[in-house]
From Swiss-Prot:
Pfam families: IZUMO. Plays an important role in the biogenesis of the acrosome during sperm development. PANTHER family: IZUMO SPERM-EGG FUSION PROTEIN 3. Belongs to the Izumo family. Izumo is the name of a Japanese shrine to marriage. Residues 196-239 are cytoplasmic. GO terms for molecular function: protein homodimerization activity. Residues 1-20 form the signal peptide. Glycans are attached at residues 96, 126. It comes from Homo sapiens (Human). This is Izumo sperm-egg fusion protein 3.
Length: 239
């Protein structure tokens, strides 16, 4: 009953969740789950959890590869089918071997996953180099967008499918960068002007204080002179 619940849930999760090249066909995920289920005897403890974990790792591997680089997004449907067939054959080979325990099984399945990752990366990279080149070679059959699971009839690609940036996004980034530079220039200019204003104001205040001091000293000298003259006159009158 646990296996049945797991296999019924897989197509639903594949439909609603993120995609990779291999899981665009929900039937393929069911087949993988069924093949993996045949590899593990029913008496193995925690069999359902083990199956669920292995299937999730397999699905995540396909997603991880196709989303690791913007250029690893499109692939010929024919190549996807061949890759799925290869993976099923690997599972059939494991199924024909004698069961030697969970750890041996996980080790062999890890080898299959590593080979699958390597093959998928190589196929996506080679196809991208051809489909995104200026003199791209015509590819027969439909092309699969591994991110959306849409089939396309395009033979050559450019823009986001080849890792090139969206012109609008690039333009918006340039505008944002210009505004940032402009704001930085305004702030720096204002700081320089404020600095010069403070220096000029400080010098001006020093000059004013100096002039005021000289003026006060001069007036004091004049006042002291007048006082001395007055005292001298008073002294003479007393005589």
């Amino acid at each position: 009953m646990g296996d049945l619940w797991l296999f019924l849930l897989l197509p639903l999760s594949a439909f609603h969740g993120v995609k990779g090249c291999l899981e665009c066909d929900p039937k393929f995920i069911e087949d993988v789950g069924s093949l993996l289920g045949n590899l593990i005897p029913s008496e193995v403890p925690g069999r359902t959890q083990l199956l669920e974990r292995q299937i999730k790792e397999m699905i995540h591997l396909s997603f991880k590869v196709s989303h690791s680089d913007k250029r690893l997004r499109v692939l010929a449907v024919q190549q996807v089918v061949k890759l799925r067939t290869w993976l099923k054959n690997e599972f059939y080979k494991l199924g024909n071997e004698t069961w030697k325990g969970v750890f041996i099984y996980q080790g062999k399945l890890l080898d299959v996953c590593q080979n699958l990752e390597s093959k998928l990366k190589e196929l996506l990279k080679n196809f991208s180099e051809i489909a995104c080149s200026e003199d791209c070679i015509v590819v027969e059959g439909p092309i699969l967008d591994c991110w959306t699971c849409l089939r396309m009839t395009n033979r050559c690609f450019k823009g986001e499918y080849c890792g090139d940036e969206d012109p609008r996004k690039a333009e918006n980034r340039e505008i944002a960068l210009f505004l940032i530079l402009l704001a930085t220039a305004v702030i720096l200019g204002s700081a320089v002007l404020l600095f010069h204003f403070c220096i000029f104001h400080r010098r001006k205040m020093k000059a004013i204080r100096r002039s005021l001091k000289e003026y006060v000293e001069k007036k004091l000298e004049e006042l002291m002179g007048k006082i001395d003259e007055k005292e001298e006159k008073d002294f003479r009158l007393r005589k």
